[in-house]
From Swiss-Prot:
Taxonomic classification: Eukaryota, Metazoa, Chordata, Craniata, Vertebrata
Species, as recorded: Rattus norvegicus
Region (Disordered): 230-334, 581-644, 731-776, 857-882, 895-914, 1172-1203
Residue spans of biased composition, Basic and acidic residues class: 313-322, 747-757, 866-877
PTM info: Ubiquitinated by RBBP6; leading to its degradation by the proteasome.
Cross-referenced SUPFAM superfamilies: beta-beta-alpha zinc fingers, POZ domain
One MF term in the entry's GO annotations: DNA-binding transcription factor activity
Protein name (record): Zinc finger and BTB domain-containing protein 38
Single biological process term from Gene Ontology: negative regulation of DNA-templated transcription
Presence of keyword Ubl conjugation: yes
Subcellular compartments: Nucleus; Chromosome
Keywords, in A-Z order: Activator, Chromosome, DNA-binding, Isopeptide bond, Metal-binding, Nucleus, Phosphoprotein, Repeat, Repressor, Transcription, Transcription regulation, Ubl conjugation, Zinc, Zinc-finger
Length: 1203
């Protein structure tokens, strides 16, 4: 017989209070809340299951699914914010705080509406008129007790408005992966000790209910979703309460800093306010589990100044006593509660006076943070500030060798005061330094903070607070906040912080269409235009990959797992920076490749010593350094440390050689002629500039302000510029036979000299050498003559310059920490320096024809071959290529700048993944020429003229072929007269359609007479011409908006009856037209034809400005609107042709071609007119040879009209 043992059920009387208290904490923090209630202008986070369990109104709302599941936002119109605050406090704490009789009435009315029975009965209760607030507590068994709270003073903030602690952002991210994840109550609360239960019991027996928190506790919560790092930096010298630091335990807390510290429970006899004992004590940042009362750990021992801790991030906690006997809860009436310390400003209670004193620091006024006087870095304690200032002071005055030492100048970030730049010391919390930094790291943590979200480490920018997953992404983003913008545009004066930004911007200059659709092979300028195209024409929704989610919170496989576009490589060659005479590094490599013996001496201008920084001479060389601590606005000669020692002899030798080569290359084109190069040696006198162990570079500009730039990998670069520069500082160091040209005069040099300097400063391959050798030979003599002419006047220029020179010094930081001596990349600091409103670097802007074509001859050959072709009217008139030849400058080679080769800042998108698809342009060119030849010979008698064409005869040269016909219309009357006189003996045949008299031999070239129908009906609004009145009437409906034809099925109206008939086929649902490529069916035949262009690639719509083909008419119209906008105000229009130039420089270059053509035509016309006058005077008009002479004269004139 089996005997069953007796068992009894064990019940936790405090479980419900514990769970309700934790839920209330989650509501205050906004954690795991799945619904947002909006009352007036305040947002309240709450749990839908708790609200449904407490209110019938919320139960019906949530069960009826009337709220959108994705947002779960509910708005209550008839309630007040302060009333709903009290209702939420009651729901989550079973406590109602009654402050005045009006509040009772409002709570009773709200309780009736929301279906809360306890609040409905509040109106029947009688409250005294005492000013002290009443706290009505309802226990678990339903017993209601009323007690008058006289211990706390009345909070004035309570009666002023609603509690804004409950206001959270609707789109605020939750810490859980799903907004509707269930609450795991066992993970966090099953380990609550008996001592905590006893404490909660004592708190319930106290006279004040802790859940009834006044508004003043808002300072402790302060949007607890913010990271620990930000809170630690924003509130120095404060102990963050456990409710504001983390509040997450077990699985809810993803941070490694969570600690479960159990405070000592020793009764104390001190007073409640013990601020004097704990006011200056540094407290660690820890977290602990939260129950009914707020509990904080014991503070760490006070650290003395002489004994710093081994790691600033180490926090020592008191060890939990394992042998301490557990306190079993007994009857509430039998146990004597221990001594509890209550806060006088809020409802918090603590076990010891130490914890209370640490908590009282939150209620004290904000103190000024401890800021380093050298780098403006903030610290939380004075001890840490003293240690940091000792290191910062030594590092700012001591030069550091370029090995494993970190950079003194990281990328600059604006400090708290906004007036200076921070130092490389870390701005992250001191507790994270041991984890995130290493001794040999080349990058410091001054630019980011680290925070943990859902267990994932994120790097946050200290300037804009943006978060990044990887540190390299943050480093790349840091250029945006830097004042050094190292990526200039190749076509305008804009400078960008990232190479990706520059690439996106330059697309609008070049007009390249690099994004190609893989379905129809149509190309687009930007990815967004491509995406809209695929959505409209291919029915592809790119949002499917991020919006389709499964019921359990996972993601579906994307519908389009492959990339739906092809990114074509860059076809347009980038323009060079004409401001540089050469690039220092590329020129040095180019000389080594060409094995040219460099000239031995170059004289650097000796600027006035009164305005120069202090120079220290070491081993006969000039050393110039600058301190990184000087702000940008401060000139470097005001207290600048200039002592720098040579630490690396091998590196110095390499840098001396690089400096020697750089100086030679920068002076090779602008000073010495190609035939006679200057040969001298680098002397030991102070004429060469170097920066200690690092090299200097001298870059001469073609702009108005030449500059001398000295850059270093460790220290700040110093840029000296002047309004004019002295080329000859010491005449004793230079022989009078050596011609030296002033850089201030180089800007006036001829284009040939500019071309030679550009070609000589770059290493060339075999193909480029073949192209440029004839050019250099042709320009040697002119450049030699020009340099020789400048040799005599150089002395006068020097004297004037030395009197008016003005030196300004800027401190420019390196482009990136990677631009060290080993990377062979010089900092591009000269690009960003500005003097006044005008930049130093002047870039030469090329013509608007930026597309590079292979096989194009060099510019000098084109100019030589253009003159005889223009002088020969026979070849010019008969050649149809003369009508469509491009007159703009073409670039014969590509130019790569240092910023283009920067490997540390690559674009995100793979710009160079695909090889260019070779397309045969020759066939398209032949078809275009043949088409123009046929259309250009027609007689445009009845066509409307271009408005500006009456004053400009060459308006139609670059227009659409219809414009060519209109252009020929100007010169047709003399041609008609010649034909009539030539065939005056033939009988005249009259055309019945156009009433024009034409001779039988009118088709002299074998072409018949073509009838052009007149259009007598003209629209008064847009001046369009029509053949009949009915067509004009139909056209007028476009202006009046009249739509007389209505669909009987859907009621849609149309202005043309044919459009209505096409529309009615849609309602029939018959799709008779099927695509032969993809078997797709269409209702209309024209829709099928448009669709088939996707497969055939036919581009039947051409721009009338630039002859670019388009697949659709709407795309062509949008493209033409851009031309119109540029013509109206954004571009620079030519007055002799419809050419639109993007810059004034390109317009001037384009107008020079018209000038040469006009002079040539004018000379030819004068000669022919003079010949004609002589013939008319010598012979009578009735002579038989007169017609032959006139025929010889008229033919060249007619051919000239088409040029």
């Amino acid at each position: 017989m089996t005997v069953m043992s007796l068992s009894r059920d064990l019940k936790d009387d405090f479980h419900s209070d514990t769970v309700l208290s934790i839920l209330n904490e989650q509501r205050i923090r906004g954690i795991l809340c799945d619904v947002t209630i909006i009352v007036e202008d305040t947002k309240f986070k709450a749990h839908s299951n708790v609200l449904a369990a407490s209110s019938l109104y919320f139960k019906n709302i949530f069960w009826s699914h009337t709220i959108c599941i994705s947002s779960h936002v509910l708005e209550l119109d008839d309630l007040k914010a302060e009333v709903f605050t009290e209702i939420l406090n009651y729901i989550y704490s079973s406590t109602v705080v009654v402050r005045r009789q009006e509040t009772v009435t409002d709570l009773a009315a709200a309780g009736k509406r929301l279906g809360i029975s306890f609040l409905e009965d509040l109106s029947d209760r009688n409250f005294s008129n005492s000013p002290g607030p009443y706290v009505v507590c309802i226990t678990e068994k339903g017993v209601v007790k009323e007690e008058k709270n006289e211990k706390r003073h009345e909070e004035p903030a309570v009666t002023n408005g609603p509690r804004i602690t409950n206001a959270f952002s609707i789109i605020e991210t939750e810490n859980s992966n799903s907004m509707f994840s269930p609450l795991d109550l066992r993970a966090s609360f099953k380990k609550v000790s008996d001592a905590m239960r006893t404490t909660s019991l004592c708190q319930e027996r106290a006279s004040v209910c802790p859940e009834a928190e006044p508004v003043r506790t808002l300072a402790e919560h302060s949007y607890a979703v913010s990271s620990i790092t930000e809170a630690y930096r924003s509130q120095p010298l404060r102990e963050h309460d456990s409710s504001s630091s983390s509040g997450k335990t077990g699985k809810e807390n993803g941070e490694a800093l969570t600690t479960k510290a159990k405070p000592c429970r020793k009764p104390k006899t001190q007073t409640q306010d013990s601020d004097s004992t704990t006011e200056n004590m540094p407290l660690p940042l820890v977290t602990c589990p939260e129950v009914n009362q707020e509990r904080s750990p014991q503070p760490a021992p006070i650290l003395s100044h002489s004994e710093p801790p081994s790691s600033e991030g180490d926090v020592h906690f008191p060890r939990e006593d394992e042998n301490q006997p557990s306190e079993t809860p007994g009857p509430p009436a039998a146990e004597v509660p221990p001594l509890v310390y209550n806060c006088s400003c809020c409802s918090k209670s603590f076990d010891s006076s130490t914890l209370l004193g640490a908590h009282m620091q939150l209620h004290k006024p904000t103190q000024d943070p401890f800021v380093c006087k050298y780098c403006n870095k903030q610290f939380t304690t004075l001890n840490r500030l003293d240690r940091h200032e000792q290191i910062c002071m030594r590092s700012s005055h001591m030069p550091m060798p370029g090995g494993n030492q970190p950079f003194l100048e990281n990328y600059p970030t604006i400090g708290q005061d906004g007036g200076s730049f921070t130092s490389p010391d870390s701005l992250v919390p001191e507790s994270r330094i041991g984890e995130l930094s290493s001794a040999g790291s080349a990058l410091s943590d001054a630019d980011h903070m680290v925070k943990f979200v859902n267990g994932q480490m994120l790097y946050s920018c200290v300037v804009c607070k943006r978060s990044y997953v990887t540190l390299s992404s943050l480093r790349r983003h840091a250029n945006v906040h830097s004042w050094r913008r190292t990526y200039p545009c190749h076509y305008c004066n804009k400078v960008f912080a990232l190479a990706e930004y520059r690439t996106r911007h330059e697309i609008w200059h070049t007009g390249e269409r690099r994004y190609q659709c893989i379905f129809c092979l149509e190309t687009f300028m930007t990815y967004y235009i491509l995406k809209n195209h695929q959505k409209s024409f291919h029915a592809i929704d790119h949002r499917l990959s991020i919006s389709k989610k499964t019921a359990n919170g996972g993601l579906k496989p994307t519908v389009y797992p492959y990339k739906l576009y092809r990114l074509l490589p860059m076809r347009c060659k980038r323009a060079p920076y004409k401001s540089y005479r050469n690039s220092s590094y590329e020129s040095a490599q180019g000389n080594r490749q060409r094995n040219e013996s460099p000239p031995d001496t170059f004289v650097i201008p000796n600027l006035p010593s009164s305005e120069m920084p202090t120079l220290n001479f070491q081993d006969g060389r000039n050393s110039l350094t600058s301190s990184p601590a000087i702000p940008v606005e401060t000139p470097s000669w005001q207290g600048t440390p200039t002592s720098a020692k040579v630490k690396n002899a091998e590196g110095l030798k390499w840098r001396k050689q690089a400096l020697k080569t750089d100086l030679v290359d920068s002076a090779e084109v602008s000073i010495s002629s190609i035939g006679n190069s200057v040969s001298t040696t680098l002397q030991a006198e102070p004429v060469c500039v170097s920066s200690g162990e690092h090299s200097a570079s001298v870059i001469s500009y073609s702009g108005l302000v030449p500059s001398v730039i000295v850059h270093s990998s460790q220290f700040s670069s110093v840029i000296k510029h002047s309004n004019a520069i002295a080329c000859l500082a010491n005449s004793n160091h230079q022989s009078p036979s050596q011609p030296v040209a002033s850089p201030s005069l180089i800007k006036d040099s001829k284009p040939e000299a500019d071309k030679a300097s550009k070609l000589a400063s770059r290493p060339k391959n075999s193909k480029e050498k073949k192209k440029t050798v004839p050019c250099n030979r042709g320009e040697i003599t002119e450049e030699a003559k020009y340099v020789a002419d400048l040799g005599g006047s150089s002395g006068k220029t020097t004297n004037v310059v030395e009197e008016t020179s003005k030196i300004e010094t800027y401190i420019a930081k390196p482009a990136l920490p990677g631009t060290s001596t080993n990377s062979n990349v010089a900092p591009l600091c000269q690009i960003t320096v500005k003097i006044g409103n005008e930049a130093i670097v002047k870039r030469h802007i090329l013509g608007s024809k930026l597309f590079y074509k292979r096989g194009r001859k060099p510019k000098y050959q084109m100019q030589e071959e253009t003159l005889p072709r223009e002088s020969d009217p026979e070849t010019r008139g008969d050649s149809p290529l003369g009508l469509c030849q491009a007159d703009c400058v073409e670039m014969s080679e590509a130019f790569d700048e240092v910023s283009d080769q920067d490997s540390t800042d690559k674009p995100w998108r793979p710009y160079y993944n695909y090889k260019p698809k070779k397309k045969s342009k020759q066939l398209r060119k032949i078809r275009k020429v043949k088409w123009r030849k046929e259309r250009g010979s027609r007689s445009p008698v009845g066509r409307r003229r271009y408005p500006a064409e009456l004053d400009r005869a060459e308006m139609g040269r670059r227009r659409y072929p219809a414009e060519l016909d209109r252009c020929a219309e100007v010169k047709l009357p003399p041609d008609k007269a010649s034909e009539e006189e030539e065939n005056k003996e033939m009988p005249k045949l009259q055309c019945e359609l156009c009433d024009g008299d034409k001779a039988a031999g009118a088709g002299a070239e074998g072409k018949p007479h073509q009838h052009l129908t007149l259009k007598p009906y003209i629209c008064e609004l847009c001046a369009k011409q029509f053949q009949s009145s009915s067509t004009l009437k139909m056209h007028m409906r476009c202006h009046t908006g009249e739509k007389p034809y209505q669909c009987k099925t859907c009621g849609r109206r149309f202005s043309v009856q044919g459009n209505l008939q096409k529309h009615e086929r849609i309602h029939l649902g018959v799709k008779e037209f099927i695509c032969q490529y993809c078997n797709k069916a269409f209702t209309l035949n024209e829709t099928l034809k448009i669709h088939e262009r996707i497969h055939t690639g036919e581009k039947r719509y051409h721009c009338q400005f630039c002859f670019q083909g388009f697949l659709y008419l709407s795309t062509k119209r949008n493209h033409e609107r851009r031309h119109v906008r540029e013509h109206d105000g954004k571009g620079f229009a030519c007055f002799q042709c419809p050419k639109i130039c993007k810059t004034a420089a390109a317009l001037r270059m384009h107008q020079k071609k018209h000038l040469f053509k006009t002079l040539t035509k004018q000379e030819e016309t004068d000669d022919l007119c003079h010949e004609n006058s002589d013939l008319l005077e010598s012979q009578p008009c009735t002579d038989s040879e007169d017609s032959d002479q006139k025929d010889d004269i008229k033919k060249p004139l007619l051919k000239m009209s088409f040029e």
